[in-house]
């Protein structure tokens, strides 16, 4: 018996998905559209009946374990998607897919290959802002675009969205061959299925720390625009590998900026983080220094270049982040571990953050700092409860929540900006501009000169190589918030023999 498929939403997206299923013939049969539009309920579209309203008709459908529902309403707000999902689950649907809505709703395109299993990202948080990708990506038409860290969560989503940008070439740079291979293959499949435009996609394996190789890559690719996402980012891991954090994040960024200025790259966009604000971890300091580098190199840019950074908070679903961790803990029966009942974070979905980054890359000016409006913070314990419920379970009854205390480099609240940065609205929704907080002349260069022999073997300074105690001392001398945080931890009696 063919799998019966119910498509939620009989609009353009739903009809296109139905057409794809009919053409491919191997995914089952579309049994009906479900829709709330009274003007089409009771009609047929290409021989497929339209039933509704969604909430009412779902309860009387006869469905088996094989049957599948596809939510194809990319314009629907998050609250409505959540309601539809809960209705489907309540009425016995075990297989629920969704057509993500960031770009499809704007461009009027939809493809079966873009559907995926629904996950908590689709029903958590606020409704993402709708951005016209084709309009915001006009500055990339016919250009060569390079993404560093293209195999990561942000880099790979930028690559997916850039398929709609009309770029001539899309370079995927990363040091992990598996992740680069994965996104490269995914983009090729999307292109084969008609998603986006026919950019030439080129995978490149390389290490940001290799100055000569990075210079060679930028020269050879003749890229016009760089989105710099590559970074070591896991805070506790970087507290155990402090030299590596500075070596890769700071000097890798410097290498890329040197090459970008030298080879006249038109636009350079650094992806930054709220952990760069009054940092309390080596990772946070590394990203703060990357921001300072961008402001410094903007002064070296010629009149046709624009060097900028875009800062934002946590994204839901990134690798190694809280959401995948909670999901894996639920799969093993719990408990879910939460740092503190008061801990809260700003969250945004990866597709929304990337759409705003791409828009900022086009409208941003040289030497400017930008911040994405993250909305209101969410308590981590509330997020844990929502994810447990999404899994069809009850918090504390089926899955326990355990308070475990802060890890190295963590704080209960992450500020998005310093008071003196004074964020102001721009002409573009959810994109704020910051007042630059630059180092005085010579301060950054002096610090980097002292950090260099710690990160890279240097004749005459062999004793400094990989000396993390000296590295942390230098960082604490430069960054008061890091020094204060480490001293507070030491006072609290926590063991920090690795750094103090």
For the regions a language model picked out, list residue spans one by one.
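Proline-aspartate-enriched helix->loop->beta-strand connector
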Residues: 61, 65-66, 167, 218, ...
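Strand-loop microenvironment adjacent to phosphate/nucleotide-handling motifs in alpha/beta enzyme folds
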Residues: 5, 24, 130, 135-139, ...
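Conserved Rossmann-fold NAD(P)-dependent oxidoreductase catalytic core, especially the SDR/UDP-sugar
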Residues: 105-113, 228, 232-235, 239-288, ...
């Amino acid at each position: 018996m063919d799998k019966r498929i119910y498509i939620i939403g009989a609009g353009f997206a739903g009809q296109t998905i139905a057409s794809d299923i009919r053409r491919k013939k191997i995914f089952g049969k579309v049994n009906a559209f479900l829709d709330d539009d009274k003007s089409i309920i009771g009609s047929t579209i290409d021989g497929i009946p339209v039933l509704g309203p969604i909430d009412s008709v779902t309860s009387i459908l006869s469905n088996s374990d094989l049957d599948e529902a596809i939510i194809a309403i990319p314009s629907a707000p998050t609250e409505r998607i959540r309601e539809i999902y809960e209705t489907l689950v309540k009425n016995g649907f075990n297989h629920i897919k969704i057509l993500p809505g960031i770009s499809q709703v704007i461009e009027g395109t939809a493809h079966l290959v873009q559907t995926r299993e629904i996950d908590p990202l689709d029903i958590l948080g606020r409704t993402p802002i709708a951005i016209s990708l084709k309009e915001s990506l006009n500055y990339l038409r016919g250009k060569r675009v390079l993404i560093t860290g293209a195999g990561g969560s942000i880099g790979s989503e930028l690559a997916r969205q850039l398929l709609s940008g009309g770029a001539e070439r899309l370079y995927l740079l990363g040091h992990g061959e598996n992740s680069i291979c994965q996104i490269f293959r995914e983009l090729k499949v999307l292109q084969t299925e008609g998603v986006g435009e026919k950019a030439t996609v080129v995978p490149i394996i390389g290490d940001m720390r290799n100055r000569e190789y990075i210079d060679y890559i930028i020269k050879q690719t003749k890229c016009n625009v760089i989105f710099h996402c590559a970074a070591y980012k896991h805070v506790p891991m970087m507290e155990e590998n402090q030299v590596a954090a500075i070596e890769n994040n700071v000097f890798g960024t410097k290498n890329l900026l040197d090459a970008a200025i030298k080879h006249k790259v038109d636009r350079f966009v650094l992806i930054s983080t709220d952990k760069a604000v009054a940092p309390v971890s080596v990772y946070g300091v590394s990203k703060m220094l990357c921001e300072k580098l961008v402001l410094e190199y903007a002064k070296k840019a010629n009149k046709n270049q624009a060097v900028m950074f875009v800062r934002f908070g946590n994204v839901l679903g990134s690798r190694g982040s809280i959401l995948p961790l909670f999901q894996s803990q639920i799969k093993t029966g719990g408990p879910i571990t939460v740092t503190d009942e008061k801990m809260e974070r700003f969250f945004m979905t990866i597709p929304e953050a990337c759409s705003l980054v791409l828009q900022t890359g086009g409208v941003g000016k040289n030497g400017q700092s930008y911040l994405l409006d993250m909305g209101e913070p969410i308590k981590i314990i509330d997020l844990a409860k929502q994810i447990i419920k999404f899994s069809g379970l009850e918090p504390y009854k089926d899955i326990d929540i355990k308070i475990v205390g802060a890890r190295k480099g963590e704080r209960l609240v992450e500020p998005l900006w310093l008071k003196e940065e004074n964020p102001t609205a721009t002409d573009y929704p959810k994109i704020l501009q910051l007042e630059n907080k630059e180092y005085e002349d010579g301060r950054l260069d002096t610090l980097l000169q002292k950090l260099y022999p710690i990160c890279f073997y240097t004749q005459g300074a062999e004793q400094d190589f990989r000396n993390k105690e000296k590295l942390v001392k230098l960082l604490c001398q430069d960054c008061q918030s890091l020094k204060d945080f480490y001293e507070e931890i030491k006072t609290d009696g926590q063991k920090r023999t690795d750094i103090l």
